[in-house]
Curated annotation (Swiss-Prot):
Protein name: Large ribosomal subunit protein uL15
Native source organism of the sequence: Oleidesulfovibrio alaskensis (strain ATCC BAA-1058 / DSM 17464 / G20) (Desulfovibrio alaskensis)
GO biological-process terms attached to the record: translation
Record-stated family: Belongs to the universal ribosomal protein uL15 family.
Pfam name, any one: Ribosomal_L27A
InterPro entries in alphabetical order: Ribosomal_uL15, Ribosomal_uL15/eL18, Ribosomal_uL15/eL18_sf, Ribosomal_uL15_bac-type
């Protein structure tokens, strides 16, 4: 017998509650919904935040600040060790190479972070670099070329 073959006995399984099946069941008549009203009807109930027609709290409170997330620059981050490991033996790594290897989604802005080691002189193209990544690339004799956009 295997773990996926185990199952509880029929009498141990809890039956689902079937409402509206006679008063003897304890859930007959109004089926636990109370008497009349919007909540007793099929599809009844109000949407979250609805306060019965009075001005809801969300609209009574003033707006504050601004929403910067609409204009925030989003970068796909790649660590330096990951980048150098994926392109061993290559001296120049372009954005197209990064996209082709699947390290970032095609067309996405790429930022290279300095986690990992860079032992070979390599020329790397990306939209942004962290200070530690630039330092490690230059220390190994390579070049970090930041692109615009």
């Amino acid at each position: 017998m295997r773990l996926h073959e185990l199952y509880p006995f029929d009498e141990e399984r809890k039956q689902r509650k079937r409402v509206g099946r006679g008063s003897g069941s304890g859930w007959g008549c109004t089926s636990g919904k109370g008497n009349k009203g919007q909540n007793a009807r099929s599809g009844g109930g109000v949407r979250p935040g609805f306060e019965g027609g009075q001005m809801p709290l969300q609209r009574r409170l003033p707006k504050r600040g601004f929403k910067n997330y609409l204009f925030k620059a989003r970068y796909e981050v790649i660590n330096l060790g990951q980048l150098v490991g994926a392109f061993e033996g290559k001296t120049e790594i372009t954005l197209d190479d990064i996209y082709a290897r699947g390290l970032a989604r095609a067309g996405a802005a790429v930022k290279v972070l300095g986690n990992g080691e860079c032992n070979v002189a390599v020329k790397v193209e990306a939209h942004k670099f962290s200070a530690s990544a630039v330092e490690k690339i230059q220390k190994a004799g390579g070049e970090a070329k930041a692109l615009e956009g």
